[in-house]
């Protein structure tokens, strides 16, 4: 059982979604998916029923009772510390994997959708391989013109209980904060084909082998279409694999038969943004960047220095303007920056030596991002060597 919610939760408000399951002729107690808000330290909760046969871990409730569960109930708690603000839930969904799942194939489809390509190696390494889900979620939104960074998604959905970004419920909630209807689902081939037919790419969970890993691991990929190879009379699927070595290798194909063997059935659906819905994310602050006497750089707002706080545990990086018109900001090449004890940022010595125009980004642990542009001074040109003195031809003695 997987539960999803999309909600607006202003500052000093939060949402808590709970569920209970009818299994073994009795209702379990309420199981909480954790208190949630964009600027709140979100933590998933491990819980279980009294007999231990129904348990919640992260974003999934598992029913081990013989015969499974036959009923579920959902409860949403809204809380606020501000008399003038309240959270609002726009979408609430529950997805169940049946014990006896009669899967359908649907009608063959030949359609390809655009989906931006992002790979793990080009983005924040803090979350390791579990950065795959924020990369796919950013791609799903950016195909509609959002231009959000995967790091913004990652820190807006991070599960503080595990310091990871693998919680799909928090991923759907983060996309909902950006204004996109988004929910978890269990899908068969017919469902996947229906999503692509409706012009919607989706995130799919695939069990596959990763280089350096002994056992297969779950990877979130972006499904962007289906096709047919007339040469070998075989169907195939079009995927974005964020574990590829580079952005250019993210687009890949897989034989449909192989895909259905590795596909777990878990998926995340995302629909276009609703214009009438106010979005809480992305939360960006335009800043200036000023140089201190020690060579570090500080964000500045309205003439006031805005140092990164002591508890800053997010991502700070810069991208050099290379003259290339990238499809999205996330396609740029990022280089990490070091935070100073005073809250400033340090450019690498080689970048200071090269100079140039740079964009600087700092995403904090809530997903809020400071953005600034700066032009580093160009290095001085080396002084020209003095010309060697030339002899006057009239003073040169003829050879003997």
PLM segments and residue spans:
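Non-cytosolic beta-sandwich-type ligand-binding/adhesion modules
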Residues: 1-98
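Surface-exposed, short loops/turns at beta-strand junctions within beta-sandwich domains
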Residues: 64-68, 349-356
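Active-site-adjacent structural segments surrounding the nucleophilic cysteine of cysteine proteases
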Residues: 69-71, 77-163, 333-335, 348, ...
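Noncatalytic regulatory segments and standalone regulatory/sensor domains
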Residues: 24, 66-82, 92-106, 229-300
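Solvent-exposed loop/turn segments flanking beta-strands in beta-repeat/beta-sandwich domains
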Residues: 10-16, 305-321
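Conserved active-site-adjacent core of cysteine acyl-enzyme catalytic domains
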Residues: 152-276, 338
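Edge beta-strands of extracellular beta-sandwich domains
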Residues: 369-378
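Short, compositionally biased P/S/T/A/G/V-rich stretches that sit at domain boundaries
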Residues: 273-306, 320, 324-327, 379-382, ...
């Amino acid at each position: 059982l997987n539960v999803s919610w999309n909600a607006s939760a202003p500052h000093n408000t939060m949402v808590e979604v709970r569920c209970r399951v009818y299994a073994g002729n009795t209702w379990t107690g309420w199981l909480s998916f954790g208190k949630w808000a964009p600027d709140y330290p979100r933590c998933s909760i491990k819980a279980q029923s009294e007999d231990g046969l129904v348990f919640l871990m992260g974003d999934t409730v598992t029913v081990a009772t013989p015969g499974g569960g036959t009923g579920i109930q959902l409860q949403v708690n809204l809380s606020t510390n501000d008399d003038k603000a309240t959270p609002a839930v726009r979408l609430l969904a529950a997805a169940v994997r049946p014990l006896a799942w009669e899967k359908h194939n649907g009608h063959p489809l030949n359609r390809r959708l655009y989906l931006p390509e992002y790979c793990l190696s080009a983005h924040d390494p803090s979350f390791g391989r579990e950065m795959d889900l924020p990369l796919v979620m950013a791609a799903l939104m950016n195909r509609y013109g959002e231009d959000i960074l995967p790091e913004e998604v990652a820190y807006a959905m991070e599960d503080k209980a595990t310091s990871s970004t693998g919680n799909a419920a928090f991923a759907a909630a983060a996309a909902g904060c950006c204004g996109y209807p988004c929910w978890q689902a269990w899908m068969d081939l017919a469902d996947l084909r229906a999503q692509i037919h409706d012009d919607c790419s989706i995130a799919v969970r695939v069990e596959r082998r990763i280089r350096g890993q002994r056992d297969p691991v779950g990877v979130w990929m972006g499904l962007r279409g289906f096709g047919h190879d007339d040469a070998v009379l075989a169907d195939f699927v079009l995927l974005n694999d964020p574990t590829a070595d580079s952005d250019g290798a993210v687009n890949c194909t897989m034989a449909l038969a192989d895909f259905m063997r590795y596909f777990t059935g878990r998926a995340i659906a995302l629909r276009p943004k609703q214009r009438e819905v106010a979005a809480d994310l992305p939360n960006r602050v335009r800043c200036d960047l000023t140089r201190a006497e020690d060579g570090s750089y500080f964000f500045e707002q309205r003439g006031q220095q805005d140092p990164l706080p002591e508890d800053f545990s997010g991502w700070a990086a810069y991208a050099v303007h290379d003259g290339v018109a990238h499809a999205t900001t996330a396609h740029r090449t990022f280089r990490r920056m070091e935070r100073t004890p005073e809250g400033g940022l340090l450019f690498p010595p080689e970048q200071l030596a090269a100079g140039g125009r740079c964009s600087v980004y700092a995403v904090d642990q809530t997903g809020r991002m400071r953005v600034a542009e700066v032009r580093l001074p160009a290095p001085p040109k080396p002084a020209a060597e003095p010309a060697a003195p030339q002899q006057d031809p009239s003073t040169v003695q003829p050879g003997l």
